[in-house]
Structure formats: C-alpha cells, structure tokens
C-alpha cells in the first residue's frame, strides 16, 4: 500500500474570537487554491487514492473534500477521529481496514500529528524522524502493514514543488 499522509491546507491564523471552537476553523481562500493545485498535481503523478480518511475537523475535512473533488473519486472522504489526535496505529488500522497490497490510501490531518504518524511508520517512534511538513504537504510511505518502522519513505512533496 502507498500511504499518502497529507497535512491540511492553510486555514489562516487561529482566532479564538471568530472561532472559539478551533475544530470549526475553515480553510482560507489561499488554502483552497493551494490544495486544488496539489490535488491536480497528484493526478498528474498518478497518485490517486482509492480511499481518503480525514480528521473530522473542518479544515481537514475541507482539504479531503478538495482532493476527492479534483481527482473525481467515487467515494467521499471517511471521517476518522484517530486523525484528530496523537497517532495510535491500532485505531487507524481499525478505520483503514485491509486495503489491497497495491492500494493508494490518503490520510488527511493536522500538525504535529501527521509528522508524528510519519515518524512512527518510518522510524518506530514519534521522535525517531524529524519531518518538516508544510500545509498541503504530501508524505508518501510504502507499507505492507500499518506498524511502527514498517514503512519506506517514497517522497515528501511540498506545494511549491507541485506548481
């Protein structure tokens, strides 16, 4: 399986006056535009997920929606509460199920949890690998199973590389 770990697109600055519940903060116009460009580039690179799991937080869900819309995927994003917290592989594995070995799966979530998930899958712990992961960045990891240190780094794509 190729796992695409995607950090949500830009959602502007945290503003407790406007968004007292930060889980409800939406993407900015800049974030929407950038992620549309990233999603189109993934298609050009033939990195089209069969399944998209997303944090239920609004900005992550909107990022996942853009990916599904731009890639014209058959299935809507699947909300996954495990992506809105410190990564627990057992919870993620339950939500993921058993995809075919050649499947491409995307997980959309938040910093620092997406960086920690990548580090766990590549190096065995959340601090084993430092990953500088920009908004709308895409980390590609080849995996046979969702387990610590089971992954092999395939790429880290930054939005600026995908114009």
Residue ranges and their predicted role:
Residues 34, 112, 140:
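Short, flexible micro-motifs
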Residues 29, 94, 98, 116-119, ...:
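Charged/polar, solvent-exposed surface patches and flexible loops
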Residues 163:
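Acidic, His/Gly-rich catalytic cores of divalent-metal-dependent hydrolytic chemistry
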Residues 8, 82, 143, 155-158:
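Active-site donor-binding loop signature of nucleotide-sugar glycosyltransferases
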Residues 125-152, 159-160:
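Domain-level recognition of soluble alpha/beta enzyme cores
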Residues 99-106, 111-137:
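Non-DNA-binding regulatory cores of transcription-related proteins
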Residues 96-106, 149-157:
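A polyampholytic, Gly/Pro-enriched intrinsically disordered region
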Residues 2-90, 94, 122, 126, ...:
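Active-site-proximal alpha-helix that buttresses catalytic centers in soluble enzyme cores
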């Amino acid at each position: 399986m190729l796992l695409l770990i995607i950090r949500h697109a830009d959602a502007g600055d945290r503003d407790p006056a406007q968004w007292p519940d930060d889980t409800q903060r939406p993407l900015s116009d800049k974030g929407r535009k950038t992620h549309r460009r990233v999603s189109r580039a993934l298609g050009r690179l033939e990195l089209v997920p069969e399944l998209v799991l997303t944090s239920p937080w609004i900005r992550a869900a909107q990022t996942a929606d853009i990916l599904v819309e731009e890639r014209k995927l058959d299935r809507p994003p699947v909300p996954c509460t495990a992506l809105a917290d410190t990564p627990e592989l057992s919870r993620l594995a339950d939500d993921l199920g058993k995809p075919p070995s050649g499947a491409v799966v995307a997980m959309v979530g938040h910093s620092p949890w997406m960086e920690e998930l990548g580090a766990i899958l590549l190096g065995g712990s959340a601090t084993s690998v430092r990953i500088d992961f920009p908004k709308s960045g895409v980390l590609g990891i080849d995996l046979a199973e969702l387990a610590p240190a089971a992954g092999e780094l395939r790429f880290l794509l930054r939005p600026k590389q995908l114009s």
